[in-house]
Amino acid sequence: MICVLANNLVLIISGSSIMKRNFKFSKIFYHYHYRPFTIYSFVYKSNFAKVPSEPGSLRNLLQRHRPYSVNREVGEVKLGEVATSVGSTLSKNLPQGSLGLQKQSGKEMNIVLTEQESEVCNILRKVTAYLKETKQLPLVELRIAGGWVRDKLLQFECHDLDVAINSLTGSDFANYIKEFLDKEGDNNNKVKIHVIESNPEKSKHLETATTNLCGLDIDFVNLRKEVYEDSRIPVSLEYGTPEDDAYRRDITINALFYNIHTGQVEDFTKKGISDLREGLIRTPLPSCKTFKDDPLRVLRCIRFASRFHFKIVDDVKDVIVKDESIKVALNKKISRERVGIEIDKMIKGPDPVQAIDLIVNLGLYDVVFSPPPQENIVSGNLRAPKFCLIVAKILSWLLSNESKDYNVHTIFHQLNENEKRALYLAAYALPYKDMTYTEKGISQPVYQYVIRESIKFSNDDVNKIKKLLSSIDFVIKTVSQNNEVLTDRRGLGLCIRELNSDWPTTLLFALSNELIPKFEYMDQVKENKEIKEINNKYTKFIERIYELKLEKVYSEKHLLNQMVLDLNC
């Protein structure tokens, strides 16, 4: 059984076949391995599509029909005769995530705790009871907040807990935990507390105490109520109610609470649960206020949209696009390290393509990937940011199982996560490929500045991206020459030595760039001969490498390798 959610329609595919046509929908939820995927508007070009036997292949079947332009609000899907070999394999994973939420009303929502989580909650309840009995303090109430609640409702694992306290600072409460455990003689939980000070200038408004309890990382922070006086920085931070705190958070699905004392999920914005159910990214307050409080939340909206394949609501998009002050604040107020952390999470997430799609189409490309000062730029022009989106989409297709059917070499499907990360990072930096700037009198590629300074990635990342971007023309030329006349052993060996151990990723990135002119035909790849011919060139080149046993020639000592090449040329 496969449940496909289309607005309020649940389509169940089972039995021998089902005939449904022209369904209008805004999103489809497909669940596999505890991850929800939302596939926005697409059109089946063919009259029918067979559902493959492997759930992972089903995901690819759906994803391949996503449009290569900006995702539209509503699309049309035509389902013809659908094979049913999936059977009960997939149904064992349902309901998950948002589909699971469809079966629960807000009042009935419960969270099932793991053994570790139960132990943590028991300790925290004991600490509050201890404080009530021994300290002259207001009643202490504890709630787990934010991402843990969201992930538990989506049935994901989460090992980081944020505990919100109504009447104490995080550090005060953490010290009381230590006091209580020492008094109880609990040798299994030796609490070490680290306090992260607030930094309002960088939008870090609250002091946070971090510790590890029962093997789980826990942050303690007080519920907040911020008071502003015509400034982006709060003039005072007061203890707030859970409702005050919920409305100060980034998005509604992160503003849910789990009350440790009652065991209930609390939705004070009245939208968190419904947005989680409907797959929407929305700010609790008007988005201009939420973003001015912390402009990094713009990127967090994008990250969570791409992580869960959710839709950012239109009023939030409009503010991001039209309010230039938000972009200025994101560029000037937020540390580049924080920006880089968000970008890294997007690249490592389930859909780096949707992430860069949103960055580009919300007009944030040169804000996030900001270039050096204009006076330092000496040559070249910024290519349209759409090119990085095009290459990212081509990479996604080349890396997918679907491309195996179109003579894309299998070596590209064996790349590890770090290699894929480098490929997408190179795609993100592509618009700066032909630009140079001067630093200390030395001319350098602008993309090096962007990676090293704008998003604060490592020098290793800079070197990897330099290799991928600088080798595009060389690889395309070498592969084309081999297609006309087979490259001899010496020439091919020197090529692999030049590309080093990264030669598979370098070839794949060059291939993705060579396919750019054919991009508009990518949804018709099966019928397009030119795309097949380009793929064939690279497959032929790789097969030549393996035929001559040169796939690891880069690791051989240079002198010995040169002699071998000379003897066999």
Describe the function of each predicted region:
Residues 2-569:
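Catalytic cores of the polymerase beta-like nucleotidyltransferase superfamily
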